[in-house]
Amino acid sequence: MTQPLPIRFQEHLQLTNVGINANSFSFSTLTMESDKFICVREKVNDTAQVVIIDMNDATNPTRRPISADSAIMNPASKVIALKAQKTLQIFNIEMKSKMKAHTMNEDVVFWKWISLNTLALVTETSVFHWSMEGDSMPQKMFDRHSSLNGCQIINYRCNASQQWLLLVGISALPSRVAGAMQLYSVERKVSQAIEGHAASFATFKIDANKEPTTLFCFAVRTATGGKLHIIEVGAPPNGNQPFAKKAVDVFFPPEAQNDFPVAMQVSAKYDTIYLITKYGYIHLYDMETATCIYMNRISADTIFVTAPHEASGGIIGVNRKGQVLSVTVDEEQIIPYINTVLQNPDLALRMAVRNNLAGAEDLFVRKFNKLFTAGQYAEAAKVAALAPKAILRTPQTIQRFQQVQTPAGSTTPPLLQYFGILLDQGKLNKFESLELCRPVLLQGKKQLCEKWLKEEKLECSEELGDLVKASDLTLALSIYLRANVPNKVIQCFAETGQFQKIVLYAKKVNYTPDYVFLLRSVMRSNPEQGAGFASMLVAEEEPLADINQIVDIFMEHSMVQQCTAFLLDALKHNRPAEGALQTRLLEMNLMSAPQVADAILGNAMFTHYDRAHIAQLCEKAGLLQRALEHYTDLYDIKRAVVHTHMLNAEWLVSFFGTLSVEDSLECLKAMLTANLRQNLQICVQIATKYHEQLTNKALIDLFEGFKSYDGLFYFLSSIVNFSQDPEVHFKYIQAACKTNQIKEVERICRESNCYNPERVKNFLKEAKLTDQLPLIIVCDRFDFVHDLVLYLYRNNLQKYIEIYVQKVNPSRLPVVVGGLLDVDCSEDIIKNLILVVKGQFSTDELVEEVEKRNRLKLLLPWLESRVHEGCVEPATHNALAKIYIDSNNNPERYLKENQYYDSRVVGRYCEKRDPHLACVAYERGLCDRELIAVCNENSLFKSEARYLVGRRDAELWAEVLSESNPYKRQLIDQVVQTALSETQDPDDISVTVKAFMTADLPNELIELLEKIILDSSVFSDHRNLQNLLILTAIKADRTRVMDYINRLENYDAPDIANIAISNQLYEEAFAIFKKFDVNTSAIQVLIDQVNNLERANEFAERCNEPAVWSQLAKAQLQQGLVKEAIDSYIKADDPSAYVDVVDVASKVESWDDLVRYLQMARKKARESYIESELIYAYARTGRLADLEEFISGPNHADIQKIGNRCFSDGMYDAAKLLYNNVSNFARLAITLVYLKEFQGAVDSARKANSTRTWKEVCFACVDAEEFRLAQMCGLHIVVHADELEDLINYYQNRGYFDELIALLESALGLERAHMGMFTELAILYSKFKPSKMREHLELFWSRVNIPKVLRAAESAHLWSELVFLYDKYEEYDNAVLAMMAHPTEAWREGHFKDIITKVANIELYYKAIEFYLDFKPLLLNDMLLVLAPRMDHTRAVSYFSKTGYLPLVKPYLRSVQSLNNKAINEALNGLLIDEEDYQGLRNSIDGFDNFDNIALAQKLEKHELTEFRRIAAYLYKGNNRWKQSVELCKKDKLYKDAMEYAAESCKQDIAEELLGWFLERDAYDCFAACLYQCYDLLRPDVILELAWKHKIVDFAMPYLIQVLREYTTKVDKLELNEAQREKEDDSTEHKNIIQMEPQLMITAGPAMGIPPQYAQNYPPGAATVTAAGGRNMGYPYL
């Protein structure tokens, strides 16, 4: 059979399947800090991304763009740390926030999470720890040891307390990879350098120690071999024994001589060490003993990153193919593996005990039996306690300890020793707990049981609770609770009175007891607790028992009050289904406690009871209010509602809100009918509250119908203030009048806005009230004053007129006066009335009323008296003015001197009477529009002009100067001729001029200004007016401009000139500039506007000013007159425009003139630009001597820039001088190339030492076929990988292959030779010199880019080299495919066999088989033996069977049959049958049982050879087909086999049938032999009968003698046992019999052993604790 493997190997994920690029599987781009996340950095379409793979959801990776050069995920949470050069950042991915950031002073070369919140940072010189918490910066822990200089840091570890730190690095030596480690103690602050490759810290607890030990495990591969060391670091804790150091060899296979450890992880779960090597081997070690448990190769590719696999206690890692692999201990197989394969039972026992692993059961059982048999009970007890999976902690073990006596010299029975050891180890199981507690309780030591329970040493069970219950009910309850026996727990709660806990417990454990039964029993014993228990039963949303049954129980005990409380709590949710219970609750209380029922109904707790029934019960109980709440029939309501003295008034008012409108009115009628006086007040309250619903009209009709004006008044008084209904207000006024509430009539007439005033006025007239004040109020409010005056005057109520104007509303006096005048009242009465009312009315209105009736003079005395009193009211003075105007009493003087009248009113009054007076009034009041209108209408333009000039109002001017004014011309004439000539105020002039300008009247404005300026006046020299005159002329009449310019002197010349230019008056502008000697501006006009350079030149010569020459030069330069411009600049001695001059001269190539200008400019300004351009001009004019002389002297020129320009323009000689001057050898080299001076170019390139320069010189040399110089240049280019491709392409494109190869060959020896050079040379060999490629690859395969060379070799069909590269690149699959595709060139037997074992794709095994069958059939078996460890043998055998090549591979089948594979066994068995090798077939069947036994047997039983049929019988026997087996033996007369198979079958019928078959053939000797063979199966009576029938008793006699002997012996033993039992019974009669064998029914009567008189105090079955089957399982005395 196949050996068990101690490990489980699993592939969790293939990273390429989730979209990760294979180029990203490397130590620098992939990190895995734990088994939860994998973090990969890769480039996708030139975009750097980080891919985060959550191993719990591996198929959905998260991608984020980043610019960092390293990323590591936190071991537990979605927190990522990013590093970009010296900048470190920590981000929370879920919160999308940055947690921390820091910039280091050094580059971080390695970093790692060492805990959930701490990062370790390793630089070139130091190690730091950076906490994720708070704002702390990285803390330096220690400096790197010198032994780690130049090493690649691959790991950093620390122990759990972070007191021991370890830094691990590796470095390449000539023949191996060396490892260096630095171990640092934080406490002691010291370091130790150690040689090692992989290490880890671990915590291990030695059996004898109290505290765990900190171990340091590390592995190293030196030149002599590998070692694993396990040592304790630091001093052992107090009381601990030190850990013995361990050092064992690490085996490395011969084919992995360069292998070395790369990773180590320690499993805390199994205390094992997982060691991973570079070649993919795993080594599994036991940490305590350093024993190697298992070693094998798990990956053909390097596993470059690992982490602990927490779920399985193993190790997880990623290899270079992107496989995520894990290895862990196989709990089921490791112990059998150690025991059977390693033959190390001690280690198997140790690991099984330490880690509670199965597989060593037989070892423990044998050891236990051995110690027990030897009487070493304590040691045997320890073995039983330590055995894994509790395999020995069984009832049988307890029984064995019970059966042994206490050894001599010992006071403790073995059983108690066993229990003591178990208690020390931990918790007892169910059987152990029972057997320990039984004698303890019998001895009355229940406190021990309590102690063990508190310490959780006992396993609680129902049986244990039953056992304890007789001694302590509370303790039993605790046991039942822990054992989860709900029925017993609830029974205990009930017996101890803890009813409140029953419901909570039942809900907690989801158990439903018979609550009704429990409640009934509680009620009998304790009604108060029963009520509480009942409430608990309905406390939840769903009641735990039927509420009706609970109520019945309450009523059985006449507990109405408690039942009420219960139902109130139970029915609090007011569900429709509880209607009957609600009715029952109210009914019982209405009959026994109406007040309680009233309170319940008052709280409105229930809504689903029988309302009609409850209403009748309420009325009978005298609860009329509740009855009304429940009645729905109007007859019932009217019967009850009239008894208002028995009802609460507020409630009754609210009750009417529940009735319909019709029912409410009917009830109100009934109440008023029954007792008007008594019920009126409540009816008014109801009507007031519900008047909106019952309608005011209906309620008014109701009260009027009963002629109850008091009720109507009170009702309306409560709503009138809020009602908008006119009828309500009118009815209220009527009711108030009829109830003599005159004050209320006054109030409502004064305040209400809702009544019909005409209707109320008529009602009050008809009412003939003694007090006319309400009528006065109505007429005053609604403007019926005229009617009021007529009514009062005609009814001789004049005193109320005086009252009205004096007390009610004096402001109505004008209307009253008008009314009195209309009724021809005496003037004296009216005057007196006016005098009585002192100024509380409008004078305007009074004047208006009197004026309308042409009686204005009536007011003259009163008006004059008011004036004399000092009245300044405009109305008074307006009236006097009107009177004076009408009477022509010096009105103009009054209008000019009086300051109180309203000008607009009086002016309007005078317009038709005297326009002059109207103008006076309007002018006094600044009534602009009115005055203009009067002047226009009456042709008073002179007055209007004077007014406008003096008014100075721009808006008013704009109005009169607008085109819409038909009188504008007449007005302007008066303004020019009269108004302006009269004024001396400049503001009047200014506003008038502005008004003309605003009105856009230029001609009129010129006329105006000429009048002011040219006619001698005080404003003739006014600068602004002169400016305005010229500007207006420019705008309106340009012919006058030149005349004004010459005549006027005091104007702003520059501004006027610029305005003239903007209006194309260039000569006028030139005349202004020339008149005022502004020559620069004057020539600018000639240049820019007149555009006449000749006049400008003449003007410049006449002026001869530098500024004028500069402006002229600039204009000439813009016109392209370079020579003239330069001459002008030289005359001006102005170098300021040197940039423009250089630009224009360069364009027209006027270099000689430019030299003259720049020489002048250089004297004035030593600018770099001027000198640079002068150098360039020298070069352009060919004056190289001047150029060389210039640059050799001091200068500020940018020679480099000019050199570049000369080079670009092909002036290489000048460029050569310039580059040489500034030592720019790079550009000088290129210049010399163009001058064909190649040697000089190479020398300059050497001085420049620039890659670009080397390239350009090299390419030029190649083009000139100067290959020696080109090679000299090329050697400086090829060392730069980025430039190599361009160089190669340049050579190849021109066909210089040999020269290129020679260049690369000579470059291989350079110190800076890199991979690209070796790679490109290999590619060139493949294309042009394939014979040299193999030698090149064998020398430099490690320095070439293998994928690139692979493609080249494949393109060149160099199959042998292709295989060689595949092998070195570890692409074994492709190597094998290439060998098989091109066997004549690529296949080599040894090489093929070596590579085929390393392939990842097992399918290649079967392609290899086909290949060998086609090409190398004789070597097939050798190859199959190589493939055997990983091949699917079933598939292989199936293939060979189909193709008919099974005989060819028989040696292979023999070699792998040890695997006990079914297909192999059947195939080999078939070959042996074909070869008739029955002995080989028998050996195969005995050695390997994994095949179809029945099919083979059926095949063989028809074989022509007896031996094969014999094997068929043997197979039938092996498969328990005894009958077929024996029949086949009988058929072939194989009697011995038949007898043996019959005996082995253990079947009586087969043996007896065989005996009968022998007797049928008279084979008596076989009969006798079968009796001996099948002795145990045969019945003596049957044998005796057969012998007697066939007369062969002699043949049966030996059998019968033996049977008789056995029976005699058995009888003797029975007699001996019986005698011994009787003796033991006699000895036990004197002992205290505790208990007899009980009945096994829980309903049994008093137990035997308990007196009947005391049995009633025990629960049923209290003394009947027995094991299943009725047999006592306790001590013998039980």
From Swiss-Prot:
User: Where does this one sit in the cell?
Assistant: Cytoplasmic vesicle membrane; Membrane, Coated pit
- List S-S links within the chain: none
Give the span(s) annotated as WD40-like repeat 2: 68-107
Q: What keywords is this UniProt entry annotated with?
A: Coated pit, Cytoplasmic vesicle, Membrane, Repeat
| CHCR repeat boundaries on the chain | 538-684, 687-829, 834-973, 980-1125, 1129-1270, 1275-1421, 1424-1567
Question: Is-annotated flag, keyword Ribosomal protein?
Answer: no
**Bilayer disposition of the protein:** Peripheral membrane protein
Segments for region (WD40-like repeat 4): 150-195
Its domain description in UniProt is:
The C-terminal third of the heavy chains forms the hub of the triskelion. This region contains the trimerization domain and the light-chain binding domain involved in the assembly of the clathrin lattice.
> Which portions of the sequence form the region WD40-like repeat 5?
196-257
Q: Where is this region: WD40-like repeat 1?
A: 24-67
What GO terms describe the biological role, i.e. biological process, of this protein?
chemical synaptic transmission; compound eye development; compound eye retinal cell programmed cell death; endocytosis; extracellular matrix organization; intracellular protein transport; liquid clearance, open tracheal system; oocyte microtubule cytoskeleton polarization
**InterPro entries, from UniProt?**
ARM-type_fold, CHCR, Clathrin_H-chain/VPS_repeat, Clathrin_H-chain_linker_core, Clathrin_H-chain_N, Clathrin_H-chain_propeller_rpt, Clathrin_heavy_chain, TPR-like_helical_dom_sf
Please give the name of this protein.
Answer: Clathrin heavy chain
**Which proteins does it associate with, and in what oligomeric form?**
Clathrin triskelions, composed of 3 heavy chains and 3 light chains, are the basic subunits of the clathrin coat. Interacts with sau.
Q: What's any one GO cellular component for it?
A: cell cortex
Function text: Clathrin is the major protein of the polyhedral coat of coated pits and vesicles.
UniProt superkingdom:
Eukaryota
Entry's Gene Ontology molecular function annotations: clathrin light chain binding; structural molecule activity
**Its principal location?**
membrane
State the residue spans of region: WD40-like repeat 7: 302-330
Region annotated WD40-like repeat 3 sits at: 108-149
